[in-house]
Design a protein with these regions (language model features):
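Metal-ion/cofactor- or nucleotide/acyl-coenzyme-handling active-site neighborhoods
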Residues: 1-256
Length: 256
């Protein structure tokens, strides 16, 4: 069974939650939101949410359950020489894999295989967790892009969160609940909870990213179609294709 068939067998007809790392989740939502996340049949965490150090924060707001970690596994340093790749350790933190839950699916939702380098580094640990790895096929990747483009034209590689929303919808869930990702609509709270990045990674990007939103006229801020994704997210919410939390529902009302 390839990874897409495996995912479809888990997702089709089920209640699915996608939970991202936005800080508003622990600032604006009730402290039983984590229990609500855990009540879904399948929970998908995004990108660097492999391990959360703050267990109280996790339990109350983001949930302790996860079946799939959907990620770009983009461990490369694309933030310039001011950021030390080996200090911020995005996807290269041994602690993440040591604390990985058994039988987790590690899904690279882009048609490449960056995880292979991570796997080589932590093979013994990852194998001990009986984790399943797979990356999307080019065909399904383009099919997902086609779906997103039907809603709003995108001309850059989508973010992990938006790709996973599209992919899950194509797998026909009974319900898809999305929380913890705003496509950088939120200007009140940081885009990531504390300790999502190790060290002062976000601070080093302050010339074009203030921790909340990007300055879209700066070169390093244009590698994803953030503004187009905001329109896609709003369309999905307004047309009842996905369910979202109360804070995110209010945020998308800003989108024209």
């Amino acid at each position: 069974m390839n990874i897409e068939n495996k995912l479809k067998s888990l997702i089709e007809g089920k209640k699915i939650a996608i939970i991202g790392p936005s800080d508003y989740v622990n600032k604006e939502l009730d402290d039983d939101h984590g229990k609500y996340i855990d009540s879904h049949d399948v929970v998908i965490r995004l990108n660097n949410m492999i391990y959360m150090e703050d267990k109280e924060l996790e339990e109350k707001y983001y949930g302790t359950k996860y079946d799939i970690v959907a990620s770009a596994f983009w461990y490369h340093n694309n933030m310039g020489k001011e950021v030390d790749q080996w200090k911020h350790k995005r996807f290269l933190d041994e602690k993440s894999y040591t604390n990985l839950k058994e039988n987790t699916i590690l899904f690279e939702c882009f048609a490449r295989n960056l995880f292979s380098e991570v796997y080589l580094k932590y093979k013994k640990i990852i194998d001990s967790k009986n984790a399943t790895y797979g990356n999307v096929t080019p065909d399904f990747y383009w099919k997902t892009l086609g779906l997103l483009n039907q809603i709003n034209k995108i001309d850059k590689s989508p973010t992990t969160g938006m790709m996973m929303i599209g992919m899950v919808l194509l797998m026909n869930p009974r319900k898809l609940y999305v929380s913890g990702m705003t496509c950088y609509l939120d200007t009140k709270h940081n885009a990531y909870y504390d300790d999502y990045f190790i060290g002062n990674y976000v601070e080093k990007k302050k010339d074009y990213f203030d921790g909340k939103t990007f300055e879209y006229n700066k070169g390093m801020a244009v590698h994803h179609p953030y503004q187009a994704e905001q329109k896609i997210l709003a369309w999905l919410v307004n047309n009842k294709k996905i369910k979202v939390d109360k804070y995110l529902k209010d945020l998308v009302k800003k989108v024209n």
